[in-house]
């Protein structure tokens, strides 16, 4: 326990070595208390592709807030860290680095290339862990996992083999999305569709007998070398007589048949479509129905192969131009129709994908999806926050396609299938015995292993492992809405299939971090923010405060430095009031302060302001805890901010100066006790969000770490509505006088006459009993509080609940301006009355709302009417003065 805070809040000093101290003290590990309820979270594993961005900071801050609070509440918490190998993304990064030296992965070979990728992984994993430390992420590093760890690899192999045995993983030749740059297959959700400028190329296919030509149109003329038919609708009278005949494929000059198929739409274009089964998913199905050949005319790098004839070796887009030119030369080009159309692009490399016939491995999704959908109607369902994302999840599951899981990469989980020279295939968790077997060179989609993350990290398939039995299913997952299908849905159906239960109880969905203008952050816009730059300038606590308070669950948040300034200012305020309290503490211990607070609550010591702040503290604890439980961190933060800044700092701390500057030593001890006790509860409430600064201040007056200190709970003894109402009225009076002074530019230092008229005897007694506070904050020359006060002829006035306040200012006041002010105030009360009246005239509200809520509205109506009537009277009095 240290003894003094620095005069100025400096986050760099506060946060410098704190994280290492936490690690050295092992405060992030599970408590091991078997009597405590377990609460576990697995980190959304960041890709080892580079440094973390603001989205990653959000992904880790929110679950860290949750786990820190649960740890303080006495749960046996596990916050498990780890990283994802991110197959295609990481391999692309390493290949780009090698390309700078003119080296390709093929130059190195698989083994040496993978050595380079592991070097990359080690480099960036260290960077990511350093960033986690700077953000204060309270994970248990003794359980750190990586998706290519042997334990996780074992789980991947078992899942693959089990699904294969059930017939839910199969190998087949189908049209898939092909990334020519990465030279790998992609799943549908790894394809981003963008509107691009393109064209419909219209060309003539001449009938075999030369009697007429059929006009077809395509956006990809370079694929025509793979055409194996043209199709017309069987009900299209224009072409019925041509079905079964042949046309001549231009340039290639080979015959292809005219087939009848519903795929051809008579209403679209000429009603004739070219069929390229190896390069279009719809054409592939037509080809299957008509037993057409499948002619692949492209290499895996997007260049044309030998079947493209003179265009072989050309890039597909160069071949497009050359093909169109050739069609024009031979008179087969009809027209080029410019248009904008949607083209799929690889999410990772950004290049246009190529629909391509390829032999791949697939997961049959039908039954897995049905199981996931059905589970959402059981007690074991996954709860989404906000709930609307449950509908998003179900929609995707209801419309899911088979999942292509093989990738033509080297970095990843190699598919556990082996082939021999006889054409036999073996699928198993271990390599087959004997010689002559060669393992499938493809690897699995990164999301295949990520889908097992919640249970593979806990030791599965060893269901007897201590972590699996204790911490699985996990409690909460935090992630962005953009990967609900990529990751969340897959974890759900894989967990249901292999563990028999949901992978997590709750899923908290957050949005995206956008720039100040609402744009998505991207390299192309140059608007990305490095979170470490923000931490260096403002501190991690300020960034965590922004990330937790920026938006509601599921909503995007806009980053701005103005918001960061506000966050820093708030922490600076906390620092300054903490310094004030600790400087006036006189060695008082927290234990003794807590005992003295008991005397305050039972009325044996202290004053009404002490009981007021404890009452409000109690309400704050209740509301913050309630909103934390609903993952409404923004609401909880707003409540904390208002209590700390407005009620505690601006009011209570100022009110205590009346005692601390007095000669009453016994009363000073009580005031110091309430200050320290309240500060301590504030720091504990704030700790999950602001771990660094709260630990620093906590260490000034307490032993141990705030990380494992008890989280505040509601104390019924603090409930004191009388003190609350009284001090709120006192605040209203002081505010009214201050506002009136400000309106007529009367300096606070100038003594004035203050008249307080009230017919409420209890309020009159309360004001008189606490007149010292009124005098301290309003600086009156004369202060009169009575029910018998005559309304002055010329005075500033204000109406508060239960009282009227007059400030005789005849020589300072402009009557016309005061009248305008009163009319404005009258309009305000009328507006409030209209709002309440509308609610109370709504039968559905009165009948269905809770009785206490309805009564609250009725109380408001009485209060507003009283203020309205008093304001009307003051207007009449002012109007008399004018006359």
From Swiss-Prot:
Comment block on domains: ValRS has two distinct active sites: one for aminoacylation and one for editing. The misactivated threonine is translocated from the active site to the editing site. The C-terminal coiled-coil domain is crucial for aminoacylation activity.
Catalytic activity of the protein: tRNA(Val) + L-valine + ATP = L-valyl-tRNA(Val) + AMP + diphosphate
One of the GO BP terms on file: valyl-tRNA aminoacylation
Pfam families in the cross-refs: Anticodon_1, tRNA-synt_1, Val_tRNA-synt_C
Keywords from the named record: Aminoacyl-tRNA synthetase, ATP-binding, Coiled coil, Cytoplasm, Ligase, Nucleotide-binding, Protein biosynthesis
CDD domains per UniProt: Anticodon_Ia_Val, ValRS_core
Top EC class for this record: ligase
Subunit record text: Monomer.
PANTHER family found in the cross-reference section: VALINE--TRNA LIGASE, CHLOROPLASTIC_MITOCHONDRIAL 2, VALYL-TRNA SYNTHETASES
Localisation: Cytoplasm
Protein name: Valine--tRNA ligase
């Amino acid at each position: 326990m240290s003894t003094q805070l620095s005069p100025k809040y400096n986050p760099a000093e506060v946060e410098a070595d704190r994280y290492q101290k936490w690690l050295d003290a092992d405060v992030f590990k599970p408590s091991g208390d078997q009597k405590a309820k377990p609460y576990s979270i697995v980190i959304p594993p960041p890709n080892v592709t580079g440094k973390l961005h603001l989205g990653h900071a959000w992904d880790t801050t929110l679950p860290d807030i949750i786990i820190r609070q649960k740890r303080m509440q006495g749960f046996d918490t596990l916050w498990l860290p780890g990283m994802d190998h991110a197959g295609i993304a990481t391999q692309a990064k390493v290949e780009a680095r090698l390309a700078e030296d003119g080296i390709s992965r093929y130059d190195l070979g698989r083994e040496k290339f993978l050595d380079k990728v592991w070097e990359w992984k080690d480099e960036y994993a260290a960077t990511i862990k350093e960033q986690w430390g700077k953000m204060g992420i309270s994970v248990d590093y003794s359980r750190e996992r990586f998706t290519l760890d042997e334990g996780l690899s074992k789980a991947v192999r078992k899942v693959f083999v089990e699904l294969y045995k059930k017939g839910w993983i199969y190998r087949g030749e189908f049209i898939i999305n092909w990334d020519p740059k990465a030279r790998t297959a992609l799943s549908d959700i790894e394809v981003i569709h963008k509107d691009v400028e393109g064209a419909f190329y219209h060309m003539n296919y001449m009938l075999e007998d030369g009697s007429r030509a059929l006009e077809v149109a395509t956006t990809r003329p370079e694929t025509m070398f793979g055409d194996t038919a043209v199709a017309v609708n069987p009900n299209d009278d224009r072409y019925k007589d041509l079905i079964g005949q042949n046309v001549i494929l231009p340039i290639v000059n080979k015959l292809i048949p005219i087939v009848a198929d519903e795929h051809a739409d008579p209403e679209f274009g000429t009603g004739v479509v070219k069929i390229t089964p190896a390069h279009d998913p719809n054409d592939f199905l037509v080809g299957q129905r008509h037993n057409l050949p499948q002619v692949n005319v492209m290499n895996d790098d997007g260049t044309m192969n030998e079947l493209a004839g003179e265009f072989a070796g050309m890039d597909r887009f160069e071949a497009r131009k050359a093909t169109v030119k050739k069609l024009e030369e031979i008179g087969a080009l009809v027209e080029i129709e410019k248009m904008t159309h949607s083209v799929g692009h690889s999410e990772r490399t950004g290049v246009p994908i190529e629909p391509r016939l390829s032999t791949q491995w697939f997961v049959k999704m039908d039954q897995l999806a049905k199981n996931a959908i059905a589970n959402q109607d059981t007690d074991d369902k996954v709860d989404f926050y906000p709930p609307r994302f449950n509908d998003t999840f179900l929609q995707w599951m209801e419309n899911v396609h088979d999942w292509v899981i093989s990738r033509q990469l080297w970095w990843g989980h190699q598919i556990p299938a082996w082939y021999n020279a006889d054409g036999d295939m073996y699928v198993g968790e271990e390599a087959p015995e004997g010689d002559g077997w060669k393992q499938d060179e493809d690897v699995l989609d990164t999301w295949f292993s990520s889908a097992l993350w919640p249970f593979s990290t806990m030791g599965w398939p060893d269901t007897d492992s201590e972590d699996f039995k204790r911490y699985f299913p996990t409690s909460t997952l935090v992630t962005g809405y953009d990967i609900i299908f990529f990751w969340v849905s897959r974890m759900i159906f894989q967990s249901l299939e292999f563990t028999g239960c949901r992978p997590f109880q709750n899923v908290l969905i957050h949005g995206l971090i956008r720039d100040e203008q609402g744009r998505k952050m991207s390299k192309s816009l140059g608007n990305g923010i490095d979170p470490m730059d923000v931490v260096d300038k403002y501190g991690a606590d300020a960034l965590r405060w922004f990330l937790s308070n920026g938006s509601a669950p599921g909503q995007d948040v806009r980053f701005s430095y103005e918001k960061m300034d506000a966050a820093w200012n708030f922490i600076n305020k906390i620092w300054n009031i903490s310094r004030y309290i600790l400087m006036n503490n006189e060695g008082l211990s927290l234990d003794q302060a807590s005992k003295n607070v008991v005397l305050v609550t039972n009325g044996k010591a202290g004053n009404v302001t002490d009981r007021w702040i404890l009452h409000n503290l109690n309400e704050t604890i209740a509301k913050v805890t309630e909103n934390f439980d609903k993952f409404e961190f923004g609401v909880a933060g707003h409540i904390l901010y208002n209590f700390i800044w407005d009620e505690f700092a601006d009011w209570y701390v100022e009110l205590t100066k009346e005692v601390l500057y007095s000669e009453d030593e016994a009363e000073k001890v009580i005031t110091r006790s309430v200050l320290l006790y309240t500060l301590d509860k504030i720091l504990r409430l704030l700790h999950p969000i602001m771990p660094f600064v709260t630990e620093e201040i906590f260490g000034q007056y307490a032993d141990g770490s705030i990380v494992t200190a008890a989280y505040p709970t509601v104390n019924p003894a603090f409930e004191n509505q009388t003190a609350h109402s009284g001090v709120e009225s006192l605040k209203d009076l002081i505010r009214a006088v201050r506002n009136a002074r400000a309106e007529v530019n009367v300096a606070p230092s100038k003594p004035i006459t203050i008249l307080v008229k009230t017919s409420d005897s209890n309020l009159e007694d309360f004001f008189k009993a606490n007149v010292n506070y009124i005098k301290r904050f309003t600086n009156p020359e004369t202060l009169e509080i009575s029910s018998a006060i005559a309304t002055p002829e010329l005075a500033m006035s204000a109406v508060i609940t239960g009282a009227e306040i007059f400030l005789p200012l005849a020589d300072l006041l402009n009557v016309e301006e005061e009248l305008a002010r009163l009319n404005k105030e009258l309009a305000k009360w009328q507006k409030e009355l209209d709002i309440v009246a509308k609610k109370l005239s709504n039968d559905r509200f009165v009948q269905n709302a809770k009785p206490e809520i309805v009564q609250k509205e009725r109380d408001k109506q009485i209060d507003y009417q009283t203020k309205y009537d008093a304001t009307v009277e003051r207007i009449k009095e002012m109007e008399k003065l004018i006359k």
